[in-house]
Amino acid sequence: EETGLPVITEVMTAEDVSLVEEYTDILQVGARNVQNFSLLDAVGKAQKPVLLKRGFSTSYEEWLLSAEYVLAGGNSQLILCERGIRTFETYTRNTLDLEAIPVIKRLSHLPIVVDPSHGTGKWHLVTPMALAAVAAGAHGLLIEVHPNPDRALSDGAQSLTFENFQRLMDGVRAVAKAVDKKVSPLAPQGVRD
């Protein structure tokens, strides 16, 4: 309420959807639950927007079929989120699949956002991957930010400081302009076509 930023909360079970819906702006279905069909059915009946993260080993077709499950429940407020897939590479937490952006935009009408924080697991990779996501046409970004990442209770290694986040946003504005996109006035909500 103080910042005006929307709150996204991960819901883990179908039984928790109505409770979580009372306290959040957007319901998140995490990567591990992308094929939890009872949960997809429940968020499909919810009145709040749903952020559907891609699973570690989920193909584009499987991800879009999971999205269809939500849409079939009556909830058309659906956002897809690329957050990295599992590959043989071990340096990063995951491999961020930026190819997913134009593929999903071609195959679906749904907006796609990118989470380079979870997609890489390393703060120094967040900015370049976020900028690449904007250039590739992402509708928005999810970025972990913390005033002191070394003291964060979770996700510190992938969190940007406020200063680094400001630098990222300066870069986002520049890349968005270069690819003829606009950054929303409430910048953390992302890039608009």
Where are these regions (language model features)?
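Conserved anion-binding
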Residues: I26, R32-E99
